[in-house]
UniProtKB/Swiss-Prot annotation:
Binds a second Mg(2+) ion via substrate during catalysis. Belongs to the enolase family. It holds the Pfam family Enolase_C. Keywords: Cytoplasm, Glycolysis, Lyase, Magnesium, Metal-binding, Secreted. The active site is at residues 207, 343. Its EC number is 4.2.1.11. Its cofactor is Mg(2+). This is Enolase. It is found in: Cytoplasm; Secreted; Cell surface. Pathway: Carbohydrate degradation; glycolysis; pyruvate from D-glyceraldehyde 3-phosphate: step 4/5. One of its GO terms (cellular component) is phosphopyruvate hydratase complex. Mg(2+) binds at residues 244, 291, 318. Its main location: cytoplasm.
Amino acid sequence: MPIITDVYAREVLDSRGNPTVEVEVLTESGAFGRALVPSGASTGEHEAVELRDGDKSRYLGKGVTKAVDNVNEIIAPELIEGEFSVLEQVSIDKMMIQLDGTENKGKLGANAILGVSIAVARAAADLLGQPLYKYLGGFNGKQLPVPMMNIVNGGSHSDAPIAFQEFMVLPVGAESFKESLRWGAEIFHNLKSILKNRGLETAVGDEGGFAPKFEGTEDAVETILEAIKAVGLEPGKDVFLGFDCASSEFFEDGVYNYAKFEGENGAKRSAEEQVDYLEELVNKYPIITIEDGMDENDWDGWKVLTDRIGDKVQLVGDDLFVTNTVKLSEGIEKGIGNSILIKVNQIGTLTETFDAIEMAQKAGYTAVVSHRSGETEDTTISDIAVATNAGQIKTGSLSRTDRIAKYNQLLRIEDELYETGKFDGLKSFYNLSK
C-alpha cells in the first residue's frame, strides 16, 4: 500500500563538511525513499530560504536542527495523520507549501520541504519498482544530457584570482553520454598535467575543478583549450566552452568590480562594458554558454546582453530566475536570457521544479539541471535531467565522489535505456540559431 507510515529527518554532512538535511519516507507496504539536500555557496537573493540554526556553538552556526525538527514535528504528523499516499506528489508538495505559508519557505525551510518532496518521490518509485527517472518522466524520459563540466573554479568557489566562478567544457560532439564523459575525463587529466608542468597548483575547489593562480580569465581559457587539443579533440566542434560568471558576486554599486577577486589586476566595468567584454570573449573563443553574465537585478543589462549575443550563445539565468516560475515568466515576457538553470533547492519542491522546466521548454528556453557547490551522494538531479529531457546537466568536474556519483548514475541510466536512449549533443542547444 502507498500510504505513508513514517517520515524521519536527520542532520548529516555535505561535501564541504557543513550540516544538511536527510529525509527518509516509509510506506505501509515497506516502500522506502531517502533524500539528501544540497546547499549553495553563491546564492541568489530571491532563492527559497535554507533554514540554518544560527547557533555559533554548533557547526559555526550552520546546523540544521531547526529544519530537521520541522520535518519530524510538523510535516511528518501532517503526512501520517492525513494518510497521504506517496503517489500524491503534487498534493504533498502543495500541502507543505501551504503549511509553510510564506513566499520563500522561510518558516519551515526549503531544505526541510525539499528533503520530504524528493524522499516521497523515491518511495513512490520504489513502490512501483521503477527507476526514479522513469517514475518522474514516464516512457518519454529518454534523453541523456550534455555534461557541463566545471574543470576550473574561480570566484567564490576557490582562492584563484579570477572573478568568473566556473570554466566549463561541453563535449557536444560525442556520440553518447558515455563518450562525452570519457572526453571530459581525458581533458581533465591533461589539464592537470599542463598545470603541473607550469608549476601551478592542482588542488581542486568545491566542485572538483582546479583552482590555480592563472594570470587572468584568458590565461584560464587558453590553458583549457590546450588541454582539449592534447586529447586530439577540436575546440568549437567536438568540445565547446562555457562560463558561469556569477556576476552578482562582484557587482557593487552599479559596477562589475573584478578587483574583488582579481585584486589590482581586476577591471571595473559598467553594464555596457560588461556586455562588450562578454561579446569580445564570445567572438574570440568557442563559447556556447554563459551563466549569470549580468547581475541578478540588472535586468536592463541582461536585455542588452540578450539582444547582442542571445542568438549565438546560451544565456543561462541562475540567480536571475532562481528556478522560480514567476521570475522566469517575467524574463520570457521581456526577452531576457534564453535558458534557466534548475536547482531543486532554489525553489524547494519537485512539483515547482518540474513546473519551471516545463515553462522554459514551452517558451523555447533550455533548462539546465544543476547541482550545488555543497553536494552529497544523492543522485536525484541525474534522474530529473533524463525524466524531463532537459538535454544538459551541470554537476561539476571529474573528481570528488559527490560529483562523480551523478555521472555514474547517468551511465547506469544510459545502459538501462539502451537503444531507446539518445544523446543529442549540439542539438540540445535548440535555443540558438547557429
